[in-house]
């Protein structure tokens, strides 16, 4: 080798080393950017189903909005709506299960809410209220309404808070709904909970969480008896957590949970749905631009609570949120204020893909 070649190598080696370090650094930035994204970054622009109007009920601070999105009383003369869970029927229609109460009673009327069923040809809406789920049982009473498809292909709707966790079942999303029974927990004969969220695990067992963040599992059907799996899985240092929503996607168990006093919600994941729940960061915040339309218009509801996910092909594709235009205590009834259920598209496939490093690490 010539002296010239040796000199060239001596000068090139530092340069090549620097380039290699730069490539590693850039790769690290790319990877970090992916893993630093949180749930809130995967909300998608919402298609405008009707038109955007300002001359509808609600505070001007919400912004121009689409009254055909989700489920609402467009006149705000009858109902406040809350909760919200979507299931797609075999015929392609979308069924939303929610609660409603007389708007004349203001937000404080939620204690007398009833479980209702609404239908739409479009995932985003509008959803048409078809009436009470069980009009001849307990006066249709129900709050914290949730719904899911059971392993045998039938359906369940469940309620909590204003009643013990009662479960109703039907072979059709259109009903009729038959009272199956009350959820039971081993060793807790007086168990009564609110904000119950139930799912079917990949192993066929039933799992639920409740307002306090405890996890319960049953290998004997949706009614249980459930086994409490330990203390709350919520992260410490975040006040007033409620409204957990639990599901499985992308090889991980997920919970979103809302801090009512800060208006922020958080996203937690676990490899087995029981242990080692990790706080992945902010899930949503109504002060951020989560409710943005495809034309760039953004709505800012005062509070968005009671999150629920709609899953297709194993990934979340939309989220429903109970939304109110003012502080709850400022909704007095017959005052042009109230609540509805909104639907926002969500890129769950991208989120699950970006969480794959975490999924693979958890499996080791």
What are these regions (language model features)?
Residues 14-26:
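Bacterial N-terminal signal peptides
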Residues 1-2, 31:
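Initiator methionine at the very start of the polypeptide chain
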Residues 5, 27-28, 331:
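A generic membrane alpha-helix/interface feature
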Residues 31-364:
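Carbohydrate-active catalytic/glycan-binding domains of CAZyme proteins
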């Amino acid at each position: 080798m010539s002296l010239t070649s040796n000199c060239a190598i001596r000068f090139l080696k530092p340069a090549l080393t620097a380039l290699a370090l730069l490539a590693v650094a850039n790769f690290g930035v790319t990877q970090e950017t992916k893993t630093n994204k949180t749930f809130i970054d995967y909300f998608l622009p919402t298609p405008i189903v009707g038109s955007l109007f300002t001359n509808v009920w609600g505070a001007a601070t919400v912004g121009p909005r689409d009254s055909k999105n989700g489920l609402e009383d467009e006149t705000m003369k009858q109902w406040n709506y809350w909760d919200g869970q979507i299931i797609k029927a075999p015929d392609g229609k979308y069924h939303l299960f929610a609660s409603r109460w007389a708007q004349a009673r203001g937000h404080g009327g939620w204690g007398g809410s009833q479980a209702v069923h609404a239908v739409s040809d479009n995932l985003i809406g509008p959803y048409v209220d078809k009436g009470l789920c069980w009009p001849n049982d307990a006066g249709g009473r129900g709050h914290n309404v949730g719904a899911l498809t059971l392993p045998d292909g039938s359906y369940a709707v469940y309620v909590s808070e204003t009643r013990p966790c009662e479960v109703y079942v039907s072979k059709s999303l259109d009903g009729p709904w038959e009272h199956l029974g009350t959820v039971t927990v081993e060793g807790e004969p007086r168990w009564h909970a609110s904000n119950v969220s139930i799912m079917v695990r990949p192993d066929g067992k039933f799992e639920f969480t409740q307002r306090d963040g405890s996890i319960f599992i049953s290998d004997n059907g949706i009614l249980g008896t459930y086994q409490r799996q330990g203390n709350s899985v919520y992260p410490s240092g975040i006040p007033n957590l409620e409204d957990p929503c639990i599901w499985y996607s992308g090889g991980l168990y997920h919970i979103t949970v809302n801090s009512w006093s800060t208006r922020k919600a958080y996203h937690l994941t676990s490899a087995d749905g029981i242990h080692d729940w990790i706080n992945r960061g902010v899930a949503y915040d109504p002060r951020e631009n989560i409710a943005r339309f495809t034309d760039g218009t953004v709505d800012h509801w005062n509070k968005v609570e009671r999150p629920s996910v709609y899953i297709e092909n194993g990934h979340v594709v939309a989220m429903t949120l109970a939304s109110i235009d003012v502080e709850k205590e400022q909704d007095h009834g017959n005052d042009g204020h109230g609540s509805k259920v909104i639907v926002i598209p969500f890129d769950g496939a991208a989120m699950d893909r970006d969480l794959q490093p975490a999924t693979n690490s958890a499996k080791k």
